[in-house]
């Protein structure tokens, strides 16, 4: 029985975000297509070489991309919407699908399962030529072999997951389209096998949440594929949860091996193996290192896991690997020496996780005693973190223990509150607003960098922020928006900003991960107990309000989003960490209210994405997520209007949860998802304030007034005009000023036209 190390995927962005910078240089026409291709090749080969040097036996090939691996698969299989047919080159089509263009709406973008990564949603339409348009995995496999002598492991998104993630077809069409995918996948696998690929990883993360009937359907698909490629060694890879509901079916699939997540699906997967065994003729790939978080492994638990498995099964081979792709972790921790010693020692980024895999292999091969020094070091680092003062704050623990039922509820029900708020705010019908942020121009970023480097004083930086704020208050007034925002020019990131001002958080210098396309984020680390220290947003918001007679919203990030967009300590339940954050935000909201701010927006874009993948686990998550939001917001007066915002989500599953938040107004991404939430509201009612986004801010394209009016018109068929707001999909931080101003002008024009029509029909 052989023992191997493997990786499921490696961060694309590069140690210094070289990947991001190359892409953006190409989009800005600072480099040409050939320079893009050459530089991307160099970055990819460097990533492969790192994994080789770390001792990984099966190095993934095909996880690298120019934008998104799901988009790669869509292009490869010919899922190219007809609206892009006038483009001729691969890159023009590819980036138009991802980002849109002046005349083309981009494909929808949404979260990859319950992670913080976004993928481009494949679109099916009648007449698609579903075929192997480009065998990209083969090209990359041969390149790695030729350039580096690496016999890699091609990684492919599986056909069942791919089609489940796609949109544009009815459920009745699913079996027919699935059948059409057999031929291109057979060709893809045949060519890889003939080229010498000794192992091919097929990712089917959707398998963790399929019904019995769907699993049987998926098995028939793989039987059809295996019949045509019988000698290819396929590893069917699952992750993000267990496969316990369908384990007995999965182990009969006609593949050489199966990969299971023993971190996020540990309990269910162990239970399945203990009860049902594992085929002796198959390889078991064991995801024993957390691919989604940044903490060092608990080696005692890892070796105990292997002892449990060995006691019940004898697979053909063992593969030691992360629980999922390392795409979700930063590249390397070596630059983070500014962190406290106990925190630094407790961290493991992607490169350190690869080292952990080789260490575990050595311990299993040569005996645990051979790595006793390393195990002792790990134990000491875990104990140092556990006993640290940051994780043992009595004030935080006392506040949590003192919570009462009334701390989670507003004094009056929504209808009564909203009437009081309308009297106080005097807003027009269909009020217009934005989601919060305005463009972070090169000047804004450069000035912030100068301030952080000590090149300008605090006073100079604050003066600059005030100038930007005033400029955009005037822009908003001139455009005719009804509720204004200060623009968030002082903030780098909607989570990082608050984490820097709360106790319990730590920050990396280079801990970047990919969010979507070239957009990278640097998640905070929730290391200790979270607590309020002092005002975080009051000064900037009050200043903005002093500049105008119109209402200015206070802008906060909600507790669930801060939790879901951070690397979270793994010694407490997530619910408890979220309650700590909510209590800290409650202080800030009370400070804003006492300073005269009458609308306070608490964004929760990550509420839906944090839901467990299995429906049986939803109720528990929704209960504490909703309670966390209410804990943060419930102490304000009835006249104070609480807003929230969500984006990138399949909201049909959580309409009841959205109601339960008891926010006075919610704004929701609508335009890029092609109006799916409008369809959801046709099936149910939502009698609270709501704004359905009227244009996609993730594309540089400026939509017309007519396009926005159409969305408003559709929305008003399912929403009460009394409670309806008009806004963009999301914040405008990543857009340019010359894109934002005309788009907002068109939005206000659309609102005026809609008001006129409503008054005419009244």
UniProtKB/Swiss-Prot annotation:
Pathway: Amino-acid biosynthesis; L-methionine biosynthesis via de novo pathway; L-methionine from L-homocysteine (MetE route): step 1/1. L-homocysteine binds at residues 435-437, 488, 603. GO terms for biological process: methionine biosynthetic process; methylation. GO terms for molecular function: 5-methyltetrahydropteroyltriglutamate-homocysteine S-methyltransferase activity; zinc ion binding. The keyword Metal-binding applies. The keyword Nucleus does not apply. Keywords: Amino-acid biosynthesis, Metal-binding, Methionine biosynthesis, Methyltransferase, Repeat, Transferase, Zinc. The active site is at residue 698. Pfam families: Meth_synt_1, Meth_synt_2. HAMAP family: Meth_synth. Belongs to the vitamin-B12 independent methionine synthase family. Catalyzes the transfer of a methyl group from 5-methyltetrahydrofolate to homocysteine resulting in methionine formation. This is 5-methyltetrahydropteroyltriglutamate--homocysteine methyltransferase. It comes from Bacillus cytotoxicus (strain DSM 22905 / CIP 110041 / 391-98 / NVH 391-98). The lineage of its organism: Bacteria, Bacillati, Bacillota, Bacilli, Bacillales.
């Amino acid at each position: 029985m052989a023992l191997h190390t493997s990786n499921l995927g490696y961060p694309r962005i590069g140690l210094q975000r070289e990947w991001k910078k190359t892409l953006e240089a190409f989009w800005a026409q600072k480099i040409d297509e050939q320079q893009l291709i050459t530089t991307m090749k160099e970055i990819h080969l460097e990533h492969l070489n790192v994994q080789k040097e770390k001792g990984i036996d099966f190095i993934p090939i095909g996880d690298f991309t120019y934008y998104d691996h799901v988009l790669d698969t869509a292009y490869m299989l010919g899922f190219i919407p007809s609206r892009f047919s006038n483009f001729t080159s691969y890159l023009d089509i590819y980036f138009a699908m991802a980002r849109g263009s002046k005349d083309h709406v981009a494909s929808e973008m949404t979260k990859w399962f319950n992670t913080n990564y976004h993928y481009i949603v494949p679109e099916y339409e009648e007449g698609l030529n579903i075929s192997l348009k480009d065998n990209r995995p083969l090209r990359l496999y041969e390149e790695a072999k030729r350039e580096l002598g690496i016999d890699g492991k091609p990684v492919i998104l599986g056909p069942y997951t791919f089609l489940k993630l796609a949109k544009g077809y009815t459920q009745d069409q699913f079996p027919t389209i699935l059948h059409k995918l057999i031929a291109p996948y057979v060709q893809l696998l045949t060519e890889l096998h003939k080229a010498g690929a000794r192992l091919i990883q097929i990712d089917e993360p959707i398998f963790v949440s399929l019904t019995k009937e769907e699993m049987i359907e998926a098995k028939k698909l793989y039987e059809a594929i295996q019949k045509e490629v019988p000698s290819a060694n396929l590893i069917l890879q699952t992750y993000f949860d267990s496969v316990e509901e369908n384990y007995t079916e999965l182990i009969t699939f006609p593949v050489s091996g199966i990969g299971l997540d023993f971190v996020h699906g540990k309990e269910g997967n162990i239970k399945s193996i203990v009860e049902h065994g594992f085929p002796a003729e198959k390889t078991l790939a064991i995801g024993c290192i957390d691919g989604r978080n940044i903490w060092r492994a608990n080696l005692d638990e890892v070796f105990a896991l292997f002892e449990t498995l060995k006691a019940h099964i004898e697979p053909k081979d063992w593969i030691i690997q992360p629980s999922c792709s390392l795409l979700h972790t930063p590249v390397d921790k070596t630059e983070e020496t500014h962190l406290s010693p106990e925190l630094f020692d407790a961290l493991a980024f992607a490169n350190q996780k690869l080292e952990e895999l080789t260490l575990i292999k050595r311990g299993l091969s040569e005996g645990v005693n051979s790595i006793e020094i390393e195990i002792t070091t790990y134990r000491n680092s875990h104990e140092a973190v556990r006993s640290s003062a940051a994780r043992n704050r009595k004030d935080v623990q006392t506040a949590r223990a003192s919570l009462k039922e009334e701390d989670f509820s507003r004094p009056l029900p929504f209808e009564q509150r909203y009437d009081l708020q309308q009297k106080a705010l005097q807003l027009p019908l269909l009020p217009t607003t934005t989601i919060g942020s305005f463009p972070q121009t090169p000047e804004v970023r450069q000035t912030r960098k100068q301030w952080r480097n000590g090149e300008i004083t605090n006073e100079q930086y604050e003066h600059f922020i005030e100038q930007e704020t005033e400029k955009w208050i005037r822009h908003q007034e001139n455009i005719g928006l009804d509720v204004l925002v200060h623009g968030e020019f002082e903030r780098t990131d909607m989570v990082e900003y608050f984490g820097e001002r709360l106790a319990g958080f730590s920050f990396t210098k280079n801990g970047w991960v990919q969010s979507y396309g070239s957009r990278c984020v640097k998640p905070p680390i929730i290391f200790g107990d979270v607590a309020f220290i002092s005002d975080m947003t009051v000064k900037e918001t009050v200043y903005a309000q002093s500049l105008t007679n119109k209402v200015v919203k206070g802008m906060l990030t909600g507790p669930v989003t801060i939790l879901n967009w951070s690397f979270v300590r793994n010694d407490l339940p997530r619910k408890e960490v979220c309650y700590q954050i909510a209590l800290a935000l409650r202080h800030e909201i009370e400070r804003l209210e006492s300073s005269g701010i009458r609308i306070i927006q608490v964004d929760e874009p990550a509420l839906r994405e944090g839901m467990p993948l299995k429906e049986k686990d939803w109720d528990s998550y929704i209960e504490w997520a909703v309670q966390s939001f209410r804990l943060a917001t419930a102490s304000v007066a009835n006249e104070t209007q609480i807003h929230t915002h969500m984006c990138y989500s399949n909201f049909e599953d959580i309409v009841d949860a959205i109601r339960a938040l008891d926010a006075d107004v919610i704004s929701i991404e609508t335009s890029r998802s092609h109006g799916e939430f409008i369809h959801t509201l046709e099936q149910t009612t939502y009698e609270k304030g709501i704004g359905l986004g009227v244009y996609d801010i993730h594309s540089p394209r400026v939509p017309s007034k007519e396009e926005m009016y159409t969305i408003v018109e559709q929305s008003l068929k399912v929403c009460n005009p009394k409670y309806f707001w008009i806004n963009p999909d999301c914040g405008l931080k990543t857009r340019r000023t010359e894109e934002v101003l005309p788009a907002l002008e068109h939005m206000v024009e659309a609102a005026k036209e809609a008001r006129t029509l409503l008054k005419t029909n009244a």
